């Protein structure tokens, strides 16, 4: 028997408890600008920390390989119904443990080793699961990549020509470092013309799409994959949305194809997050995410920094640091010293190595969750520019850190 007041983390494992407390304090004290990170609600965290973690539930609602699944069936069906409604999908699988596994589920269901796939080049903003040589997708399939034009938008004409030439089995849209709107309808027409399946990885944009502030790929794609964290602000996990005709193949690919028992406590967190995402406050939040990103980008450009593509139309932006004679790796470090958390990121045709880079990627979802609006976004952009103007001046770093502390104290994550 477990007595709740005796089996607490601080009593059982002080080392882990201390690390959790320190991470909690870091999240409160630092301004989080990593585009793929966000803060979940206490309700989502409570679902993830529930007794559902104890339950094995191989299979799907109403068709399990274990007994005692009547209540986890309720939870999973709620998650399925809510995410379908949220995005207007015909069918959904909420069991993938990550966005990468959601992508793998589509590959496993619809492709054979050696098939040709088309995805956005990682070097120009794509994701490693879309065909990077070291990733499973790059090892199992023949990969052809599309990229950007001179204006640093997707080169749709070149994409179409490449698809006509290579006749891929699957075309993938979606990115991890691309700030503009993606024309999903146009790519869908290309896929149809060459007889390819069309998959969209909307992991970065899912929250914006749910709120209607970014184009929805669901009406145009055979498959739409996503993570459930990032802009969607749920637990770490994945989802596959699909046309009804593909539901059986996808479900079989996830279980028993690439996964065993689903993580029911995480699926509960997904269900809660999907309900939160249906609220008017979530729509207002996503509208503010876009406003804050735009305010940051405009301020950084006014301070002499180049934004890749010249603007942002979403939550994310890439900052070209070459004019400041500082690498992405160095910028990540000095901004971190100032309690501003970013990640180094390659820019298109980056001359630096992947672990060095010439840029940083910034995103507005987490700071917007804190309650930041345009005024704070402008302040944050100025603080970033202040650090990058004098990256080795300790007094400058300390001054910025003090201003960050004022903002984070005014806008706590968890009040």
Curated annotation (Swiss-Prot):
(6S)-5,6,7,8-tetrahydrofolate binds at residues 122, 126-128. The modification N6-(pyridoxal phosphate)lysine is found at residue 230. GO terms for molecular function: glycine hydroxymethyltransferase activity; pyridoxal phosphate binding. Its EC number is 2.1.2.1. The keyword Amino-acid biosynthesis applies. The keyword Transferase applies. Its main location: cytoplasm. One of its GO terms (cellular component) is cytosol. Pathway: One-carbon metabolism; tetrahydrofolate interconversion; Amino-acid biosynthesis; glycine biosynthesis; glycine from L-serine: step 1/1. Gene3D superfamilies: Aspartate Aminotransferase, domain 1, Type I PLP-dependent aspartate aminotransferase-like (Major domain). The record marks 229 as: Plays an important role in substrate specificity. Signal peptide: none annotated. GO terms for biological process: glycine biosynthetic process from serine; tetrahydrofolate interconversion. It is found in: Cytoplasm. It comes from the Bacteria. Its cofactor is pyridoxal 5'-phosphate. It catalyses: (6R)-5,10-methylene-5,6,7,8-tetrahydrofolate + glycine + H2O = (6S)-5,6,7,8-tetrahydrofolate + L-serine. Coiled coil: none annotated. PROSITE patterns: SHMT (PS00096). InterPro entries: PyrdxlP-dep_Trfase (IPR015424), PyrdxlP-dep_Trfase_major (IPR015421), PyrdxlP-dep_Trfase_small (IPR015422), Ser_HO-MeTrfase (IPR001085), Ser_HO-MeTrfase-like (IPR049943), Ser_HO-MeTrfase_PLP_BS (IPR019798), SHMT-like_dom (IPR039429). Keywords: Amino-acid biosynthesis, Cytoplasm, One-carbon metabolism, Pyridoxal phosphate, Transferase. Belongs to the SHMT family. Catalyzes the reversible interconversion of serine and glycine with tetrahydrofolate (THF) serving as the one-carbon carrier. This reaction serves as the major source of one-carbon groups required for the biosynthesis of purines, thymidylate, methionine, and other important biomolecules. Also exhibits THF-independent aldolase activity toward beta-hydroxyamino acids, producing glycine and aldehydes, via a retro-aldol mechanism. Homodimer. This is Serine hydroxymethyltransferase 1. The lineage of its organism: Bacteria, Pseudomonadati, Pseudomonadota, Betaproteobacteria, Burkholderiales. The gene is glyA1.
